[in-house]
């Protein structure tokens, strides 16, 4: 039986392979640690980060409770959508980075969908 880490890595590589086929759009990449959530919009053709948001930002960090929860994921999603809109990005590819589309990842994606299409 495979360990959880191997399943995660396999899922991550499968997602990245599918995303690499759509190289004409920017990539919304998500990373989640035990304490924080990070979101970046990356241009893979130029290898640069266009916009970034996380629970470490001063606007989101004001709440002293747990940083990695659904409420903060919604705030990060809205913040990354606002930064993408100001940068003129309307359409991205969602890279969930091997995480299952559930809970915190789903909340962040739904909040980002208000201004970004993916």
UniProtKB/Swiss-Prot annotation:
Cross-referenced Pfam families: Ribosomal_L18p
Q: Which UniProt keywords apply?
A: Ribonucleoprotein, Ribosomal protein, RNA-binding, rRNA-binding
Q: Does the keyword Ribosomal protein apply?
A: yes
Q: Which domain of life is it from?
A: Bacteria
Which SUPFAM superfamilies has this protein been placed in?
A: Translational machinery components
Which GO terms are recorded in the biological process aspect for this UniProt protein? Answer: translation
Family annotation (InterPro entries): Ribosomal_uL18_bac-type, Ribosomal_uL18_bac/euk
Give the Gene Ontology MF terms in alphabetical order.
5S rRNA binding; structural constituent of ribosome
* GO CC annotations, alphabetized: cytosolic large ribosomal subunit
Q: Does the keyword Cytoplasm apply?
A: no
Question: Entry's NCBIfam families?
Answer: L18_bact
Summarize subunit and interaction data from the UniProt record for this chain: Part of the 50S ribosomal subunit; part of the 5S rRNA/L5/L18/L25 subcomplex. Contacts the 5S and 23S rRNAs.
- UniProt function note: This is one of the proteins that bind and probably mediate the attachment of the 5S RNA into the large ribosomal subunit, where it forms part of the central protuberance.
Similarity annotation: Belongs to the universal ribosomal protein uL18 family.
Q: What is this protein called?
A: Large ribosomal subunit protein uL18
The organism encoding this protein is Rickettsia prowazekii (strain Madrid E)
From the UniProt record, report the name of the gene that encodes this protein: rplR
């Amino acid at each position: 039986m495979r360990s959880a880490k191997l399943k995660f890595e396999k899922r991550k590589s499968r997602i990245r392979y599918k995303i690499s086929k759509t190289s004409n759009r920017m990539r919304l990449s998500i990373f989640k640690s035990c304490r924080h959530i990070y979101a970046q919009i990356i241009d893979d053709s130029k290898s640069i980060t266009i916009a970034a948001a996380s629970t470490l930002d001063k606007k989101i960090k004001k709440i002293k409770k747990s940083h990695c929860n659904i409420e903060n994921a919604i705030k990060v999603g809205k913040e990354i959508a606002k930064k993408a809109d100001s940068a003129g990005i309307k359409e991205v590819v969602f890279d969930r980075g091997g995480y299952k589309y559930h809970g915190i990842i789903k909340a962040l994606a739904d909040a980002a969908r208000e201004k970004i299409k993916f």
